[in-house]
Amino acid sequence: MTTRYIFVTGGVVSSLGKGIAAASLAAILEARGLNVTIMKLDPYINVDPGTMSPTQHGEVFVTEDGAETDLDLGHYERFIRTKMNRRNNFTTGRIYEEVLRKERRGDYLGATIQVIPHITNAIKEKVIAGGEGHDVAIVEIGGTVGDIESLPFLESIRQLGVELGRDRTLFMHLTLVPFLGAAGEVKTKPTQHSVKELRSIGIAPDVLICRGDRAIPANERAKISLFCNVEERAVISLKDVDSIYKIPALLRSQGLDDLVVKRFGLECREADLSEWENVIYQEANPNGEVVIGMVGKYIELPDAYKSVNEALKHAGLKNRVSVTIKYIDSQTVEAKGDEVLQGLDGILVPGGFGERGVEGKILAAKYARENELPYFGICLGMQVALIEFARNVAGMADAHSTEFNKATPFPVVGLITEWVDEEGNVEQRHEASDLGGTMRLGAQLCHLLEGSKAAQAYKGNTCVERHRHRYEVNNKYRERLEQAGLVFSGLSSDRKLVEMIELKDHPWFVAGQFHPEFTSTPRDGHPLFEGFVAAASAHQKRDLKK
């Protein structure tokens, strides 16, 4: 199979939405029957984002094969059916690490290792390998043109453009076309300078995606075409919209997919965007609203919970309600108590690391349990629910996780020292292990308890979900917790690790050690999120009747 490559770069400012634009184009091409994948090349020196602060970088998205990747890969999976893997995201740090490892082994036979050709060759090899087996591979280059960190990546794709030829490569550049209120007009000069910068390093864009808060007038598009040496039909206006799921149709209406298909000489059907039209209709026509309190510690940056936010919205679509997320700092719960939890239709406690704010999460779980408020715990959210139950129901007053208190008399949650990975291999860890790349990661099979809410949600006795954690339920206390009424509704493939818990006599109190948000999509949703939002809606209706 001959793979075609679309390289997506950004200019003027960061955070223009290259990932959404790339994913939207991929969705249109997929709707035309093409097999599409997307890659993200990140210019930072970290080997992966696994140890980066969520408040700086946003969430870490985990792929099926256990790669800790950029949150843009979450966008990719939500827009197309192709599942991402570790080949879909790599960083400057990983490239340098691999090149230096080869140098130490003597693979370069004494050569002087340089950015060109050794680093650029390593980048090109990964891009080609990531695109194998697909009709089209869209490659997003992180950062902004002009950043020193991005230069090796830009040089690599320039070389690929020459080596593969114009019939297999296309360069798409995303820029900002701002509107100046005082002048009453849009300004194209930033775009012109961005393209000039790109051309100075040898890349001439074939398509310009021009971002702005309004549609760009035809005369300004003609001006951009003239000064940037890009066909006028290839100057695409991408205005702000109230839903990212409207972007595929917006790009399709301007013929971006036709331009790509003709450039590559591909024969394929017209795009069928009916599934996306259905998503947009459901989003615009809810029959009600629910308020979900998300009790977390990284709430100053909502992107730290990007996949959870999107999964709640997807569940709202399936339940025909709009979901309003109320972000609640868990430290505020510690300081003010349950008064900040009033008026919610459900509580969700997401994952997290470190002791800060953990008692607030435990209080949130207690409030939900005692007030029969729907509760959904994810990763740490499951652990705090179990700790709360152990303390206040099972009679273990000082129960805790050894992550937060190594001297606790009741370590109901402890470090996982051994587990079986998705390929059946035994993994081992200890307290002195590195932080990076040492967690239980990736898709794992889970056995569900027959008759449990979990089994009802999944409509079966097994599920496969993605993990990212170091700590687990301590099996020493399982029997005591079960006797107190806690239901262990999900177990690992070898039945040695607890994957899900729930409360039997509660409208909806379910928690999982895994991260179900990573597999939720706008078209398909996710059974646990759907069940949670349905329970929140039912709780709201009961309150209204009272």
From Swiss-Prot:
Keyword Ligase set for record: yes
One example of a Gene Ontology biological process annotation: 'de novo' CTP biosynthetic process
Binding-site residues, Mg(2+): D72, E140
EC number: 6.3.4.2
Sequence positions that bind CTP: S14, D147, I148, E149, K187, T188, K189, P190, T191, Q192, K223
InterPro entries tied to this protein: Class_I_gatase-like, CTP_synthase, CTP_synthase_N, GATASE, GATase1_CTP_Synthase, P-loop_NTPase
Gene Ontology terms: cellular component: cytosol
Coiled coil: none
Residue numbers annotated as active site: C379 (nucleophile), H515, E517
Binding site for UTP: S14, K187, T188, K189, P190, T191, Q192, K223
Pfam families: CTP_synth_N, GATase
MF terms in GO: ATP binding; CTP synthase activity; glutaminase activity; identical protein binding; metal ion binding
Catalysed reaction, written as an equation: UTP + L-glutamine + ATP + H2O = CTP + L-glutamate + ADP + phosphate + 2 H(+); L-glutamine + H2O = L-glutamate + NH4(+); UTP + NH4(+) + ATP = CTP + ADP + phosphate + 2 H(+)
Binding annotation for L-glutamine: G352, L380, G381, M382, Q383, E403, R470
Keywords annotated in UniProt: ATP-binding, Glutamine amidotransferase, Ligase, Magnesium, Metal-binding, Nucleotide-binding, Pyrimidine biosynthesis
Uppermost EC category: ligase
PROSITE patterns: GATASE_TYPE_1 (PS51273)
UniProt pathway: Pyrimidine metabolism; CTP biosynthesis via de novo pathway; CTP from UDP: step 2/2
Chain residue ranges for the region called Amidoligase domain: 1-266
Regulation: Allosterically activated by GTP, when glutamine is the substrate; GTP has no effect on the reaction when ammonia is the substrate. The allosteric effector GTP functions by stabilizing the protein conformation that binds the tetrahedral intermediate(s) formed during glutamine hydrolysis. Inhibited by the product CTP, via allosteric rather than competitive inhibition.
Role, per record: Catalyzes the ATP-dependent amination of UTP to CTP with either L-glutamine or ammonia as the source of nitrogen. Regulates intracellular CTP levels through interactions with the four ribonucleotide triphosphates.
Family label: Belongs to the CTP synthase family.
Subunit structure: Homotetramer.
Protein name: CTP synthase
Organism lineage: Bacteria, Pseudomonadati, Pseudomonadota, Gammaproteobacteria, Alteromonadales
